[in-house]
Amino acid sequence: MVANSGGGLTDADGGPVRHIPVLLKEVLEALAPAPGKLILDGTFGAGGYTSAILAAGADMIALDRDPTAIAAGQSMVAAHAGRLTLIQSQFSQLADHAPQGGLDGVVLDIGVSSMQLDEAERGFSFSKNGPLDMRMSASGVSAADVVNHAKLADLIRIFVFLGEEKQAPRIAHAIEKRRAEAPFVTTRDLAGLIEIVTPRKAKDKIHPATRVFQALRIFVNDELGELAQALFAAERALKPGGRLVVVTFHSLEDRIVKKFFADRSGRAGGSRHMPMVHERLATFDPIGKPMISASDAEAEINPRARSAKLRAGLRTSVQAEAADLSIFDLPNLASLGKLGG
C-alpha cells in the first residue's frame, strides 16, 4: 500500500483503498514482514493489512468469516498468484489453516470492519437503516432474534457485560414493552427507541445506541470467545521468533489481549477463579511498549483510530500451553436462556 499522487492510498494492484487500516505503520513495525516470511491475517476485511504486508514481500494466508469479504478479495488473490491464500473461516480456527509452528507472524484487527459498517443491509450501524442483523456470516441468531425473543434479564446482562451500558435496565424494559406491540425489524427501530429512552446530552461524545449495538454485535458473533481462542491458536501456530500483533477497539477486547500476554509472559498471576501461580517459562516476550495507541494526527484523519490499541508479542521456543479460558475472567453468558424460552 502506497500513497498515490492525490495523497490517498492505493493497494498493491493500483486500485483505490476505501478502508484505511488503523495503526498501519505500527503494525508493520511490530510484525516485521519480509520476503521469505509467511504471515497470517486473521481478519482480512477490506484487505488493508494484507495488501501492505504483501507489498513488503511476505507471503500471506488471510482469513475472514464474512463471505462478502472473501468474494471482494479474489482480485487481490489473482494479482498475487501463489503468494496469497484467502480462506473463509473464523479466526479462532487459524491454526487449522497454517502449518503448526510454521508462521512468522499473525495479525488480528478485532471488531467490525468499515466495509461492514458501510453496508446498511448488514445491520451493523445505527446511522444507516437496514435489517437488524449484525451477523458476520449467515449462520446463527441475528440481533433481531436477540432483541425480539431474549428474556428481559438476559437482555440486561448482555447490555451490561458486553456493552458496559449504564442504562441497561431502562433500555431493556423499553425493548420488552415495544416488542409486545410490534417486533424490531430494522436498525432504525432499535436506535430510535434508545434515543427516546436515553436522549443524547450535549456533553455526550457517542450516540446513545452505541453501547447497545456493540453488545448485540459482540454477543451475536461471540467476539470475545473468538478472540480468546484465536490467541491460543496463534500461540500454537507461530514458530520461535514469530510475532503476534493484535489491534483492538474497546476495553473488553483489550483486556483479553492484555491478560493473555501477561499470562504468557511467565509472570505470576491469578484471577478470582484461579489462585496465584508460580512464575513459569514465557511463551511470549513483549515487543516494544506494552500498548500503543494512535497519534493525534492519525485519529484526526481516521476517526476509527481514536480508540485503537495495539499489543504485540514475540514467540519464544517454549512449548505452547493448554488453552485455559479462565485466565480471561470472561462474563459468563453461556447460561442465558434459549431465545423465546
Curated annotation (Swiss-Prot):
Its EC number is 2.1.1.199. GO terms for cellular component: cytoplasm. GO terms for biological process: rRNA base methylation. SUPFAM superfamilies: Putative methyltransferase TM0872, insert domain, S-adenosyl-L-methionine-dependent methyltransferases. It is found in: Cytoplasm. It comes from the Bacteria. It is an enzyme of class 2 (transferase). S-adenosyl-L-methionine binds at residues 47-49, 64, 91, 109, 116. InterPro entries: RsmH (IPR002903), SAM-dep_MeTrfase_MraW_recog (IPR023397), SAM-dependent_MTases_sf (IPR029063). One of its GO terms (molecular function) is rRNA (cytosine-N4-)-methyltransferase activity. It catalyses: cytidine(1402) in 16S rRNA + S-adenosyl-L-methionine = N(4)-methylcytidine(1402) in 16S rRNA + S-adenosyl-L-homocysteine + H(+). The keyword Transferase applies. Keywords: Cytoplasm, Methyltransferase, rRNA processing, S-adenosyl-L-methionine, Transferase. The keyword S-adenosyl-L-methionine applies. Belongs to the methyltransferase superfamily. RsmH family. Specifically methylates the N4 position of cytidine in position 1402 (C1402) of 16S rRNA. PANTHER family: 12S RRNA N4-METHYLCYTIDINE METHYLTRANSFERASE, S-ADENOSYL-METHYLTRANSFERASE MRAW. This is Ribosomal RNA small subunit methyltransferase H. It comes from Rhizobium rhizogenes (strain K84 / ATCC BAA-868).
